[in-house]
């Protein structure tokens, strides 16, 4: 359905590259736009905070009732990791998700008519950072966030004293592993569909369409392009997809009485416990950068192409996750989020994956360097200084060529969209 998105341009509709990312499917897991300890949710009878005001109240009430942990450590409302590139994940990205309800397009927002905006230029994000500044001055945001290392950040999470995060699970996961090893599942994190206000919709489950820009192609120096095409053709076939996603029948998977694929408990444990499972078995090893189906897409037999499906995700839930699903009367944690069918799939692919000219990248890098330090300054300054600090950042971004970068990216997006329409 999205094959045309692979076209190079309107003037040159050739396809030089296949996508390295999954086509179609459903999202069964998400970190949400923010994360909150299960213990906090339980104390609030599993009420889900959906706005910043509700989130703030819940944090303040819990800190008032539990100023220290059982280990005697001061409770921290939430913390951030901003000493290196992680600032984009914990300080930058959540602003777009929460304030603008925007999907992940890196440092950019795409407005009406496919016009690009450097996201910190957004009025809504100004208000989001104003809230961050307020949380810092009231002691809810960790006063050490701006000076700590990423290792410090993970250690605080592992201590169980941090009630909330604005992050993604692959980043804070090492801290959670320590908590789980200590049996402190209540101190691990629930994904939340948090937004700035009731009028903003959390975009976590939004399908952004086929990701193009990163992928696999055949070079002009390829000695046997016919063989390469045959290989790609096989990888994309039903047989090829089952082989790379599931492995070998009778070894890595079996068929039930209805002819549907399943894995034994031992195989599932092997796949999750052995970090070299993919290399040893080949299962999942050839997914990236080759084309593959997304989760829940079914083959002609009614089996899913991937091993990740609704049932496997539910079976993997821990005690806290199962209790929450029961309290919410849902099957999946993602059921409390705005669903994918509530959103329109954009005409463009995720912007972060697009190839961009060197001139654009040079300006964009300057913009990010300015925003990195300036946003931290905005957050840690006094509430009275906030607007002046934010205005200075916008002025510095404009002087660094923000308008030129926005125009260049707008032209790239509109050219890509024109190739499809």
Language-model features: locations:
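Glycine-rich, aromatic-bearing surface loops/beta-hairpins
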Residues: 211-214
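Conserved small-residue motifs centered on glycine
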Residues: 240-373, 380
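Helix-loop-helix "hinge/cap" segment bordering the ligand-binding cleft or interdomain interface
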Residues: 9-87, 110-156, 161, 165-168, ...
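Histidine-centered catalytic/metal-binding microenvironments
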Residues: 373-421
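Second-shell loop/turn segments in exported
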Residues: 43-48, 115-119, 352-361, 375-383, ...
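Hinge/lid segment of periplasmic solute-binding proteins
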Residues: 1-32, 89-128, 132, 180-209, ...
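A ligand-binding cleft/hinge motif common to bilobed small-molecule-binding domains
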Residues: 169-182
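Short, 15-30-residue, compositionally biased linear elements
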Residues: 100, 119-128, 358-373, 388, ...
């Amino acid at each position: 359905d999205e094959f045309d998105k692979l076209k190079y341009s309107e003037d040159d509709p050739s396809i030089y590259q296949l996508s390295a990312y999954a086509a179609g499917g459903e999202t069964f897991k998400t970190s949400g736009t923010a994360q909150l300890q299960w213990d906090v949710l339980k104390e609030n009878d599993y009420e889900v905070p959906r706005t910043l005001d509700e989130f703030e109240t819940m944090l303040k009430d819990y800190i008032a009732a539990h100023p220290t942990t059982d280990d005697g450590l001061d409770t921290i409302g939430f913390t951030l990791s901003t000493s290196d590139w992680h600032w984009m994940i914990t300080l930058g990205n959540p602003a777009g998700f929460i304030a603008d309800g925007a999907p992940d397009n890196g440092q950019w927002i795409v407005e009406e008519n496919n016009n690009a905006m450097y996201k910190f230029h957004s009025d809504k994000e100004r208000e989001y950072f104003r809230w961050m500044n307020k949380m810092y001055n009231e002691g809810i945001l960790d006063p050490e966030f701006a000076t700590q290392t990423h290792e410090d950040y993970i250690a605080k999470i592992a201590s169980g004293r941090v009630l909330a995060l604005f992050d993604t699970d692959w980043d804070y996961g090492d801290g959670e592993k320590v908590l789980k090893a200590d049996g402190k599942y209540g101190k691990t994190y629930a994904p939340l569909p948090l937004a700035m206000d009731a009028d903003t919709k959390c975009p976590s489950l939004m399908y952004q369409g086929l990701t193009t820009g990163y992928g696999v192609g055949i070079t002009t120096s390829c000695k046997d392009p016919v063989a390469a095409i045959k290989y790609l053709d096989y990888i994309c076939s039903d047989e090829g997809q089952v082989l790379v996603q599931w492995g070998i029948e009778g070894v890595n998977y079996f068929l039930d009485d209805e002819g549907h694929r399943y894995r034994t408990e031992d195989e599932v444990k092997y796949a999750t416990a052995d970090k070299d499972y993919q290399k040893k078995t080949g299962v999942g090893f050839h997914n990236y950068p080759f084309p593959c189906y997304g989760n829940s897409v079914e083959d002609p037999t009614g089996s899913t192409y991937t091993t990740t499906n609704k049932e496997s995700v539910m079976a993997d839930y821990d005690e806290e996750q199962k209790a929450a699903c029961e309290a919410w009367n849902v099957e999946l944690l993602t059921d409390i989020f705005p669903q994918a069918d509530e959103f329109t799939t954009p005409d463009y692919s995720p912007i972060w994956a697009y190839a961009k000219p060197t001139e654009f990248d040079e300006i964009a890098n300057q913009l990010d360097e300015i925003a990195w330090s300036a946003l931290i300054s905005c957050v840690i300054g006094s509430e009275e200084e906030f607007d002046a600090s934010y205005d200075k950042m916008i002025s510095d971004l404009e002087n660094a060529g923000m308008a030129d970068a926005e125009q260049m990216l707008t032209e790239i997006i509109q050219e890509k969209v024109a190739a499809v329409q």
